[in-house]
Amino acid sequence: MDLWQLLLTLALAGSSDAFSGSEPTAAILSRASWSLQSVNPGLKTNSSKEPKFTKCRSPERETFSCHWTDAVHHGSKSLGPIQLFYTRRNIQEWTQEWKECPDYVSAGENSCYFNSSFTSVWIPYCIKLTSNGDTVDGKCFSVDEIVQPDPPIALNWTLLNVSLTGIHADIQVRWEAPPNADIQKGWMVLEYELQYKEVNETKWKMMDPILSTSVPVYSLKVDKEYEVRVRSKRRNSGNYGEFSEVLYVTLPQMNQFTCEEDFYFPWLLIIIFGIFGLTVMLFVFLFSKQQRIKMLILPPVPVPKIKGIDPDLLKEGKLEEVNTILAIHDSYKPEFHSDDSWVEFIELDIDEPDEKNEGSDTDRLLSSDHQKSHSNLGVKDGDSGRTSCYEPDILETDFNANNIHEGTSEVAQPQRLKGEADLLCLDQKNQNKSPYHDACPAAQQSSVIQAEKNKPQPLPTDGAESTHQAAHIQLSNPSSLANIDFYAQVSDITPAGSVVLSPGQKNKAGMSQCDMHLEMVSLCQEDFIMDNAYFCEADAKKCIPVAPHIKVESHIEPSFNQEDIYITTESLTTTAGRPGTTEHIPGSEMPVPDYTSIHIVQSPQGLILNATALPLPGKEFLSSCGYVSTDQLNKIMP
């Protein structure tokens, strides 16, 4: 493809020689040459050994010059003299002919100089090189495109200041514009670029272009030699021209202590030594305070200590001695009055009270009370046997209708205890058939009648009458006392909160036992008044020492009903003293267990109560009135 283009160019050149006087032919040749170059810029009309244009420049935008290379001869063929032809590409004047270079000498060898008379700034130029009539190279350009100013002249520098350390200094570099550039009239506006470097360096440091002819250069090292040069170009167009002559700048030594190299503060060395010093101080501190730090990080395990007990006993595991010490000291004794929360209430089957109590002594004792309080039946007992002497603040409203009923209950409690003693005496009289016991019912009857006379009469309200009133009325009749059994079982609870007893095991005893019960009841009445169906162990002890112990000849095994039964204090006391006939020294005290804790719920109406622990021989008995466990009950029972 390149060969055919070359042949076409040669053909056009030959036709131009044949028609040298024809201007249109020359224009066609020039147009063809430039079209070939535009299609393939690397394409040259001549070989690489032929002359070609190197540059065209206008230093002041008024004149310009073009330069080319020398021709190289190859073989026997030699080129003729090189000629430059130019033409102005005026669109309106296509008839203008090609003209030869006006001056081959002023711009130097292998150059053509165009003075101001041949220079037109706004009209493009086309030039070509020919040898023996053949075009070897050509190009088109505008004068504004080839403006390259001459180098600035008269470079110098002045010292501005020196740093406090005497290591760096600032200078001011000045120069003058090219003498042929019309700067004063504004025909050209130039930009300047300054470059500097140390003498031994190869890379130049460039500064930003400026419009002025002076620029400061900062932070130059003292005792160093620098090279400075400047070049210029037309503002916003064109290329930079040649550099000016190199200006050498040498800064003298301002301080005799100034070193050749830069003085750098040894920050890294200071940081390393600082870290090392802090590490050493930290290790010294840890070594001196290691015991205290160890206690802070790993505190010692506290030694087991109990006030009044040797810690060695706990370490050696001597639990028996520890328990003995705990039993001696009052402050370590356990409390037995905690609530039994597993029993919430007792449900009573009182839908048909007449059928349940029909034909029994309880029916005869409480016949009048059931008629008056039948409308109040169906009440649930929420006490569950948990009330003790440690709970004196329980409201009386659960057992009485109003404050008047409270007075009635307080008076009725001693009468009830006395009535139970009378019942026991009557029962023994009927069994023994002894005339000696005939005086007991009379005394009992007189005491009951006297108690009823002294008892205040309450107002007639619902639930105000106690079941013991009916019991005392029945006791006043001598004919009915013979058939009354010993009441030791709870069969019902009235709406007012009183306990209804049922006949239990008969106790055979002599007349002295009857007198003992009467005297014990009278003494208990003098000391305190019982408010509840159960009483505290401390209160029971007040009654026990007065009663003398007698010799019991025979005992009958009490049979406990598995339904509707409460095991009371009297029944368990009788059972505990059953094995063998024993004689007691007069005046000795026999502790009576206090049954205030529910042990087993056998049926909706049957409960078995736990007794508090009796004092063992040689040990102090606990004075609290709390609930006791089954193990303590087993220790008391033989």
From Swiss-Prot:
GO terms for molecular function: cytokine receptor activity. GO terms for cellular component: external side of plasma membrane; extracellular region. Residues 1-18 form the signal peptide. Residues 356-372 have a biased composition (Basic and acidic residues). It is a single-pass type I membrane protein. Residues 353-388 are annotated as: Disordered. A motif (WSXWS motif) lies at residues 240-244. InterPro entries: FN3_dom (IPR003961), FN3_sf (IPR036116), GHBP (IPR025871), Growth/epo_recpt_lig-bind (IPR015152), Ig-like_fold (IPR013783), Long_hematopoietin_rcpt_CS (IPR003528). A motif (UbE motif) lies at residues 340-349. Keywords: Cell membrane, Disulfide bond, Endocytosis, Glycoprotein, Membrane, Phosphoprotein, Receptor, Secreted, Signal, Transmembrane, Transmembrane helix, Ubl conjugation. Residues 294-379 are annotated as: Required for JAK2 binding. Glycans are attached at residues 46, 115, 156, 161, 200. Disulfide bonds join 56-66, 101-112, 126-140. Residues 151-254 form the Fibronectin type-III domain. Belongs to the type I cytokine receptor family. Type 1 subfamily. Receptor for pituitary gland growth hormone (GH1) involved in regulating postnatal body growth. On ligand binding, couples to the JAK2/STAT5 pathway. This is Growth hormone receptor.
